[in-house]
Amino acid sequence: MARSLKKGPFVDDHLMNKMEKLVASEQKQVVKTWSRRSTIFPQFIGHTIAVYDGRKHVPVYITEDMVGHKLGEFAPTRTYKGHLADDKKTRR
């Protein structure tokens, strides 16, 4: 179910404060965050945010196309290694 329009998009306060400081200082630093639920705002464009995937921080460079999406969409939590080959062939 989608979020109500009257509420507006969600961003964690600590992440928004960090990004506002970066924009004001005009620096290009990597910002570490655990907030996968935060929505990407237009102010984030051009910055790199390291999003936690449960094991490590994955650097995500924010582009125009990402605005409105959640940070967690760009840091997958599960790694698919493919199905294992059948062992019957190797035993012979």
Curated annotation (Swiss-Prot):
User: Which molecular function GO terms apply here?
Assistant: rRNA binding; structural constituent of ribosome
GO CC annotations, alphabetized:
cytoplasm; small ribosomal subunit
Membrane-spanning regions, if any? none
- Which BP terms from GO are recorded? ribosomal small subunit assembly; translation
What keywords would UniProt list here? Ribonucleoprotein, Ribosomal protein, RNA-binding, rRNA-binding
HAMAP family tied to this protein: Ribosomal_uS19 (MF_00531)
Known NCBIfam families for this protein? rpsS_bact
Protein name (record) = Small ribosomal subunit protein uS19
